[in-house]
């Protein structure tokens, strides 16, 4: 067993099943890599990432918890975002929301 590894006896687990998702094209206009973690409010990411921030409001990357996506300088890639769940209150990050969505 690898530290942190999960071994299940059932079928594959579907992440975020039934939640609203959005697919966006993201361009890194910076001269260095930018990495975004799984639960970062995507609309508040580094300003050098070019994408539709209004469409990303209240959403995060639709990837496994604890993982991240890296955008190399000049790279363009398509990402899938998923709605935040729970109370849908956003605090911290770049301080743009600081409360309910």
From Swiss-Prot:
Signal peptide: none annotated. Its main location: cytoplasm. GO terms for biological process: urea catabolic process. Disulfide bonds: none annotated. It is an enzyme of class 3 (hydrolase). It is found in: Cytoplasm. Keywords: Cytoplasm, Hydrolase. PANTHER family: UREASE (PTHR33569:SF1). This is Urease subunit beta. It comes from Polaromonas naphthalenivorans (strain CJ2). The lineage of its organism: Bacteria, Pseudomonadati, Pseudomonadota, Betaproteobacteria, Burkholderiales. The gene is ureB.
């Amino acid at each position: 067993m690898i530290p942190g590894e999960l071994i299940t006896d059932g079928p594959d687990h579907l992440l975020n099943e039934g939640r609203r998702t959005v697919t966006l094209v993201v361009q890194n206009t910076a001269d260095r890599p930018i990495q975004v973690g799984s639960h970062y409010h995507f609309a508040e990411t580094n300003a050098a990432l070019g994408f539709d921030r209004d469409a990303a409001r209240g959403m995060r990357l639709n990837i496994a918890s604890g993982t991240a996506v890296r955008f190399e300088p000049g790279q363009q890639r398509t990402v899938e975002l998923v709605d935040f769940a729970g109370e849908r209150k956003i605090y911290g990050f770049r301080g743009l929301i600081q409360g309910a969505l």
